[in-house]
Amino acid sequence: IPLSVFHFDCFWMHEFHWCDFEWDKKCFPDIRATLKKYHDKGLHICAWINPYIAQGTAFFKEGAANGYLLQRADGKGVWQTDNWQAGMGLVDFTNPDAVKWYTDKLRTVLDCGVDCFKTDFGERIPVDVVYHDGSDPQAMHNYYTYLYNQAVFSLLKEVKGENEAVLFARSATAGSQKFPVHWGGDCSANYPSMAETLRGGLSFAMSGFSFWSHDISGLESTATPDLYK
């Protein structure tokens, strides 16, 4: 099977450190040497990320102390949720200093030899929060993913160049076609989900998106032989 990109999903970081963007030293004691081996074989490297910051990390403490995470509407500090992992906070991409803080950390990942990012999530955005620039949380629910992917894509353009910058993004809104490529999220391995995926791709094409992808044979459960074929 032809292969051009090798992807590291969430466990390139230590479990429940999603996301502090630190390689798990137990699994990758010399990540630069590891990624060089892949590059020497002509492969590009993709790493999984999201905009949620685990409360048990130094990165969370730094973000909370500097006001880089979305705040509670009642003024009692960082808004947190257990949707993905316990007590995570969300980066406030309306704060230019928070964008720089977040992308500077991603820059260290690129420096290790990573070429692009899978920008997961971005759609589970609360409406009972306060943004740095005073944005309406209801309006920001869909726009958040635009700012998230814009920040990451802009970094990739700066570091990798206009013709090499690419994402593998999960969530989107109007205008997100400027930050390709998107995929259809976590579809199930059954015929109804396959039909939904095809309809989603056609909708994307009609909405100005030139590129899209999906999970081969579905993500949830295992496809039957007939479905896989």
List the model feature ranges, each with a label.
Residues 1-229:
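Catalytic-domain carbohydrate-binding cleft regions of carbohydrate-active enzymes
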